[in-house]
Amino acid sequence: MKQLPEKIALDKAVHGQRLYQGSVEIQKMSRLIDLLADADGAISFSIEFERARGLLGKAQVKVSADLSLICKISQKKFMFPVEIDSTVGFIDDLAYEDLLDIDMEASWVEEGFIKPLDIIEDELILAVPDIPFNEGHVDDSKEEDLNVAEKKPNPFAVLKNLK
């Protein structure tokens, strides 16, 4: 498999309607690592460049990964599956931001080049929840609290007899 280039000339990628796909190790994403429990694993991706009216171009970005997060409730590690399918519009002037479709994310282009790994990493960072929570986690302490509450006699039960 061909390695993902560090930088891509955007105009060539757009006019050639290039497709980059493959996988990359999570360890190569320094900003994302700070949000994860560990940097094990790989990410599958696909970036397909297209022409876009009024913009420098756009890309269909698809990313698939299992990210290792720490549940804020249980403080245990869990795998968070991520499936991303988004459209990124490339701009080099804020005036073009209004030309982006409503469902399109903006990506700033400097000197005509983009870094595809940064685009993938940006998408993953946006997918990580602010407060990671393992939905499959059952909090044992809450279950015990419910059982204790059920076993205690209701102090108002005696009022029932006063009628």
Spans of features found by a protein language model:
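Short, low-complexity, polar/charged sequence segments that are solvent-exposed and flexible
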Residues: 27, 39-43, 65-67, 79-82, ...
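Hydrophobic residues in beta-strands and at strand termini
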Residues: 24-26, 49, 90, 116, ...
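Charge-rich, low-complexity linker and terminal segments
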Residues: 1-17, 92-163
